Every structure is written in structure tokens, then in C-alpha cells.
UniProtKB/Swiss-Prot annotation:
This is Elongation factor 1-alpha. PROSITE patterns: G_TR_1, G_TR_2. The lineage of its organism: Eukaryota, Sar, Alveolata, Apicomplexa, Conoidasida. Residues 151-154 are annotated as: G4. Pfam families: GTP-eEF1A_C (PF22594), GTP_EFTU (PF00009), GTP_EFTU_D2 (PF03144). Belongs to the TRAFAC class translation factor GTPase superfamily. Classic translation factor GTPase family. EF-Tu/EF-1A subfamily. It comes from Cryptosporidium parvum. Its main location: cytoplasm.
Amino acid sequence: MGKEKTHINLVVIGHVDSGKSTTTGHLIYKLGGIDKRTIEKFEKESSEMGKGSFKYAWVLDKLKAERERGITIDIALWQFETPKYHYTVIDAPGHRDFIKNMITGTSQADVALLVVPADRFEGAFSKEGQTREHALLAFTLGVRQMIVGINKMDTCEYKQSRFDEIFNEVDGYLKKVGYNTEKIPFVAISGFVGDNMVERSDKMPWYKGKTLVEALDTMEPPKRPTDKPLRLPLQDVYKIGGVGTVPVGRVETGIIRPGMNVTFAPAGVTTEVKSVEMHHEQMPEAVPGDNVGFNVKNVSIKDIKRGFVASDAKNDPAKGCEDFTAQVIVLNHPGEIKNGYSPVVDCHTAHISCKFQTITAKMDKRSGKVLEENPKLIKSGDAALVVMQPLKPLCVEAFTDYPPLGRFAVRDMKQTVAVGVIKSVTKKEATSKKK
């Protein structure tokens, strides 16, 4: 796979039965970094298990199992190339914490592929189905580019009437959420049979649109914020024998280089970067979008952990916060949310309880106009301005300064009850600890 193509991160969203896994598996299978030997091995195993029909989803299941078992993910397995771009699938659907991952992970997505099934569309698109929630989330979290794959066209005899019906429904909803649907390709596909995935299908002469691969090639490459100061939320911290402490994470903004002094917030620990590695290769620098491990001097694995943020000690270093003000949209909370409510907030890689200190205003979701000052309570469907206080040290940023560190999910009762975008942050003046 060539190094010269622009990289784009793709998140695949949609209901459980939409055929996301098969569709994603098909792309990776046809265009991806899985070598023929591995594919033959998977095919042999899947036919031995009588799963021959599921070979694309099977590819994905095997990858998922490997991803869940092992620490090191062979990222190449999750990549595929279109004529124009190099795509990485950054979250495989069907994961228990998918919505949480979408928020902490969608910060990483440049494009969302929304897969809707032609066979059981009504169920997937009902109030209870996840399709609407995923689309709203993608928009709230700043993913502005989308492709809609109307999948399983083989189950409705490739009928135009069915495509049109689903198109109208999804198009209407996406407009309501805030998407400019003129720019969204709607593609008629079968991830299982392969229609309009890579090659144009001859079964839908009425369909004048693009294949999925052509649609992927019409997306705009992301503008990577290299000119902003460094922000790198830690996904994990490893202790590697003979090397030392190695934090791992994705560069969100700025650049990280060996020799640089980095500060980890909220702890205020500062140290020197010895080396930066990606896919087991040393790099002279890493830029936004790169998933890297970097080796740091004299820092114990006890000093830093997942959810901390690495930043340049000499250029707007990150700090912990006293509190932050956010616009919060309540998605599905069974009751009423009042001042004092203290759910878990997932922001970038951090997972910390935060208190709704003051709900200062209820607002209109679309226009942002204030509807009511200091409301007594908010409930599902409401948008509000809330001052939030972390109950443990936390580093977040305003969405306008550092977008990936300025959006979050509110989790309670094992589900995402709200999402938020941070307007402003009261920072703690850190007492720095030099290492």
C-alpha cells in the first residue's frame, strides 16, 4: 500500500442488522491490506464452520476478535485504498460501547458511512433503532461528511421504489439534524452480493448514482490541524522491558517530535520525548491523525494513565480544569435531569464522573436561542447550557480551540444519555512537576 495517498478516517454507523460488518468486511477484503494468505485461511475456516456465506462479515469478526485479544492491533488490517485515498476504518460497528466509542472515536472520523438496510429499514429507523441516534451523534460531534449506503438491495429485488422510499425518509431526517444532504451521496448497494461496492451493478439500471468506492473518492481530505499546539490524549500507557514507559495515543492537533518536552495534564508531569514510533517504525515526527507510541524519560507508569493529555510544555501546555460550560443535548434519559446530577462523562479518552453544577439555560437545538433561563430540569430532546464540574482531575478544551477535546458523551445506566460540546473551560493553574 502506497504512502503517498491522503489518509482519511472512516467510521461506519447504522443499526445492528444493517449489514455494516459485511459491507465493511467487503471493502477491506476487496481493497484492503489483508494479504491473500490470511483471506484464504479465513475462507477455509469459515467454510469449515459452514459460514461460507458470511465470508466478509467473517473477515471482520476475525479482525475484531484479534483486536480484542491482543494489545497490538495490526492497523494494516483495517485499511483499504480507493483510487484516490487511503482509508482507515477507525471503529468497527457492533461493539457494546459503540456510541461511547463513536464520541471518543468519532473525534477521529473524517467521514461517516451510514448503512441502512433495505429489508428491515422501518425497525432500524424507528425511534428505538440506533440509526437516527448515530446520525445525530456524528453531526453533533463534527463529522460533516457522510455517505449513505442503502444496503441489502438484493433483498427487495433491487426495486427503485424501495430505494426512493428509504432515500426520502433518511434525507428528511439528515436535513433535520443539520446535514447539507445535497453533498451526501446515497448509494444503492449489497455488501453481501457486492452490487455497487467496487464494480457497478447491472441489476439496477434505474440507479444513476455512484458506486461506494466512487462515493468515497468524492470526499474532501481533512485539514489536519498541524499548526495548533500539540494535544495527544493517551489511549494506554505500556511498560516495555528495556525501553521504559511508552504512552500510546493519537495526535489530535500539533506535532510531536523526539527531543520535545511534553507536559501531561491534568497531572502536570513534564518530561522529554526520547522517540516516537508508528507501526514499529521510528518517526522523526508525528502529525494529527497518527496513532503513535512514544517513549518518555523518567516517568513511571504510575504517573500517567489513559485519559491524560500530552502537550508541548513550551506552547500552550494542557491543564486540568475546575469546571467547563457546555451545550448538552439530552438523547435518551428516562427521567429528569436537575442540578447535581453526576453521571460519567467520556471525553476524548478520559472517563470521569462530572456534576451538572448549574443548568443555566434551555436552548433551541437548531438556532441556539435561549428558551428559558435557569430551568428546574431538562429531559430527553432538550438542549441546554450547563456548567459541569469534574469529580476527579480532568483535562478538556473548548471545542473551538481543540475540537476532539471539546466534545463528550454523558453515560448513565449503561447507555449514552446525552452528548455535549464544550463552550469554555476554567483551567486549573498547574503546579508543575519536572521529571
